[in-house]
Amino acid sequence: MPRTYIHVHSNPLPGKEAEYNSWYENVHLPELLEIEGVKAYQRFVLAPVQMNDKKQSHKYLIQLEIDSDDIPETISRMYAAHPTMRMKPVADFANLELSVVQVVTEEVRKT
């Protein structure tokens, strides 16, 4: 099975960016790592320079690496764990963008 990732695009609520970053790093992402099938995570923030002048819809991206042959089951575990997670009203949860992606081409580096 190809390597699989879940991408979560999100924004902090206005005036809550420091709390948002602290909550993600110290609470939410460690909770996600406890879910069977979630192997690793990385967080990204938009760089100050973009490819064009188009306004980006989300400032932050989380990439969760999934280590499972049953992706739907892992996603079900994530949703099932949600009620017990220590959620905090610091993110615009109503406008999250979620996607599941799989590797098509392994990393190729210039030599």
Question: What spans do the regions from the language model cover?
Answer:
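Macromolecular interaction modules
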Residues: 1-111
